[in-house]
């Protein structure tokens, strides 16, 4: 789960991480009142969406007068902000953060993420913070330092000093940097975050360290013990299809292709998408119906897939272990009739009650294309899309 920058900064304040004074605003009038309350003389008007790259996309503006605050708030609120993380359609800006300007002497990058490979938390930091960190990571990976933190030990002073010296924090500011790093790690640990990213973390002219941005991801499996974080959830920032799928215990992620996928098991779902790509197609979604699929769940899965107007064909790929093929077949037939399916449908089934499942599909009278292997299924669904062009 993601939250907005201003919400992340509320969390950081609770953990004694220095951040600029700021006030969220949901209208132009609120933005002006927020600026008046902060006092100025310089303010930053920041779009609040669940995506990075806002500055490059025109979603962050420096205002030096109330007129400019009003002007930029009017321009940004309601805009469809496009960044490298939003996709070509962008995201609508429904809220702003009005913040005091900062005396920036140096920008750093700092983040904490979970590293499953080492089963540790890893701090990644760089002396090259700011809007171009992605380019830095790609072209100069040596400028990104990593410090692995054993969760049984926690972040030590030695770890903090390695990070601070590695990114070039001045000697006089290292004690404060050490405190900030420790408090950031405590924020990450105590909130069950899977990512805390501060970009930029700044050195001010007075030598103080401050978090100028705040990006959080939280482990959804731990949200049950963090109602205060769940309260930050902004449904408007989430994919409507993914929200609908979660109501039926379906694991669904929207993609940019035109071939809908309905599969049981996350591993098989990913392999199915890879195979579609291998044979020249583009998957429109990841969809795992799990091991307890019913006719209702399959029907809802079809409805969710077909709400995406880009879907030109559907591939159902089922391995009958816990899930019986005849149950899925019944669900597919019911779903096709319920949604009045008009796009080509390819079904591949293997496993428990496979023959019975195939018979149910064959006897349905529906124009279902059958396949015996994953390669054959992918070939047929790609061909079906091409035929309908």
From Swiss-Prot:
GO terms for molecular function: ATP binding; magnesium ion binding; succinate-CoA ligase (ADP-forming) activity; succinate-CoA ligase (GDP-forming) activity. GO terms for cellular component: cytosol; succinate-CoA ligase complex. Mg(2+) binds at residues 199, 213. It is an enzyme of class 6 (ligase). Its EC number is 6.2.1.5. Keywords: ATP-binding, Ligase, Magnesium, Metal-binding, Nucleotide-binding, Tricarboxylic acid cycle. One of its GO terms (biological process) is succinyl-CoA metabolic process. ATP binds at residues 46, 53-55, 99, 102, 107. Pfam families: ATP-grasp_2, Ligase_CoA. Binds 1 Mg(2+) ion per subunit. Pathway: Carbohydrate metabolism; tricarboxylic acid cycle; succinate from succinyl-CoA (ligase route): step 1/1. Residues 9-244 form the ATP-grasp domain. Substrate binds at residues 264, 321-323. It catalyses: succinate + ATP + CoA = succinyl-CoA + ADP + phosphate; GTP + succinate + CoA = succinyl-CoA + GDP + phosphate. HAMAP family: Succ_CoA_beta (MF_00558). Succinyl-CoA synthetase functions in the citric acid cycle (TCA), coupling the hydrolysis of succinyl-CoA to the synthesis of either ATP or GTP and thus represents the only step of substrate-level phosphorylation in the TCA. The beta subunit provides nucleotide specificity of the enzyme and binds the substrate succinate, while the binding sites for coenzyme A and phosphate are found in the alpha subunit. This is Succinate--CoA ligase [ADP-forming] subunit beta. It comes from Polynucleobacter asymbioticus (strain DSM 18221 / CIP 109841 / QLW-P1DMWA-1) (Polynucleobacter necessarius subsp. asymbioticus).
């Amino acid at each position: 789960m993601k939250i907005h920058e201003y919400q992340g900064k509320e969390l950081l304040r609770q953990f004694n991480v220095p951040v600029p004074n700021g006030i969220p605003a949901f209208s132009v009038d609120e933005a002006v009142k927020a600026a008046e309350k902060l006092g100025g003389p310089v303010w930053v008007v920041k779009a609040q969406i669940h995506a990075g790259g806002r500055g490059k996309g025109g979603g962050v503006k420096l205002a030096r007068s109330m007129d400019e605050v009003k002007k930029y708030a009017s321009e940004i609120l309601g805009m469809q902000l496009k960044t490298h993380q939003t996709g070509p359609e962008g995201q609508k800006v429904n809220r702003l953060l009005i913040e005091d300007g900062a005396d920036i002497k140096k920008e750093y990058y700092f983040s904490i993420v979970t590293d499953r490979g080492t089963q540790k938390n890893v701090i990644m930091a760089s002396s090259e913070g700011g809007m171009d960190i992605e380019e830095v990571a790609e072209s100069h990976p040596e400028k990104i330092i990593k410090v692995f933190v054993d969760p049984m030990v926690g972040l030590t002073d030695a770890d903090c000093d390695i990070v601070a010296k590695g990114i070039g924090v001045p000697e006089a500011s290292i004690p404060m940097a050490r405190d900030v790093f420790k408090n950031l790690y405590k924020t990450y640990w105590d909130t069950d975050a899977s990512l805390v990213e501060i970009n930029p973390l700044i050195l001010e002219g007075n030598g103080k360290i401050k978090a100028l941005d705040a990006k959080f991801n939280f482990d959804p499996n731990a949200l049950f013990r963090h109602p205060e974080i769940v309260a930050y959830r902004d449904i408007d920032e989430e994919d409507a299809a993914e929200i609908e799928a979660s109501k039926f215990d379906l694991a669904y992620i929207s993609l940019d292709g035109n071939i809908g996928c309905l599969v049981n098991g996350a591993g098989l779902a990913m392999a199915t998408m890879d195979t579609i790509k291998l044979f020249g197609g583009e998957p429109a979604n990841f969809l795992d119906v799990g091991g307890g699929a019913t006719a209702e769940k399959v029907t809802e899965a079809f409805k969710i897939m077909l709400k995406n107007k880009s879907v030109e064909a559907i591939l159902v790929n089922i391995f009958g272990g816990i899930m019986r093929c005849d149950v899925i077949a019944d669900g597919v037939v019911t779903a096709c009739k319920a949604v009045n399916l008009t796009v080509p449908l390819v079904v591949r089934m293997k496993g428990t009650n496979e023959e019975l499942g195939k018979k149910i599909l064959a006897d349905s009278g529906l124009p279902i294309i059958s396949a015996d292997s994953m390669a054959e299924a992918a070939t047929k669904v790609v061909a079906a899309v091409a035929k309908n062009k």
